[in-house]
């Protein structure tokens, strides 16, 4: 198997399982831990993450290694495009049992009974401290979000409605216009600045999802983050439209 010198952030692999006879082609981030990777595989093969054993095979179907370190990154193994990851299920389900849904027993379970079970996704995530059960990570993410919101609020407070401004677009081009709105919105979290451009370089008419924030012509309105806005003496540019 050929492994590139500089690994891409994602990798395309084939997923096979001891529970069925087909393969799935999927793309995953190399930054996933094996524990997180198993959780994603649950939706692909139907096996509980806590009952999985993973094996890595090359594009030539040669066995390379087991993926058995829960806290190791997927990218720390010699995984490259075209490899196959085989899931061995230890839950006791027979081959093909998940392929015919008519054979799957349908039942309901109370939240209390589900909480007591040890082979569920929830119990696995709790033991591995993943997702909402990683209190330290969640606290860190909440603190970072609060910090970003505080910084955006400070930047927004320096921008006044009616001010002339220059906006740095994602392609780094500069666009001039007038500030028409500053504050929170319903369409996305955080603080936003509504701008009426001098030219039809925007994406809306001052409204988003049926709610109007300011008035302007179609394609002249845009909402940008405060960090992309510079207020000052930016007169409307003369494009020579009055010249003969």
Curated annotation (Swiss-Prot):
It comes from Mus musculus (Mouse). One of its GO terms (cellular component) is microtubule. The lineage of its organism: Eukaryota, Metazoa, Chordata, Craniata, Vertebrata. The modification Phosphoserine is found at residues 65, 110, 128. It is found in: Cytoplasm; Cytoplasm, Cytoskeleton. Disruption phenotype: Mice display significantly longer axons than wild-type mice. Overexpression of Tbcb causes microtubule depolymerization, growth cone retraction and axonal damage followed by neuronal degeneration. The modification N-acetylmethionine is found at residue 1. The modification N6-acetyllysine is found at residue 219. Supercomplex made of cofactors A to E. Cofactors A and D function by capturing and stabilizing tubulin in a quasi-native conformation. Cofactor E binds to the cofactor D-tubulin complex; interaction with cofactor C then causes the release of tubulin polypeptides that are committed to the native state. Cofactors B and E can form a heterodimer which binds to alpha-tubulin and enhances their ability to dissociate tubulin heterodimers. Interacts with GAN. Interacts with DCTN1. Residues 183-225 form the CAP-Gly domain. Disulfide bonds: none annotated. The keyword Acetylation applies. Phosphorylation by PAK1 is required for normal function. Ubiquitinated in the presence of GAN which targets it for degradation by the proteasome. Pfam families: CAP_GLY, Ubiquitin_2. This is Tubulin-folding cofactor B. One of its GO terms (biological process) is cell differentiation. Widely expressed with highest levels in brain. Broadly distributed throughout the neonate brain but restricted mainly to ependymary cells in the adult brain where it is concentrated in the cilia. Belongs to the TBCB family. Keywords: Acetylation, Chaperone, Cytoplasm, Cytoskeleton, Developmental protein, Differentiation, Microtubule, Neurogenesis, Phosphoprotein, Ubl conjugation. GO terms for molecular function: alpha-tubulin binding.
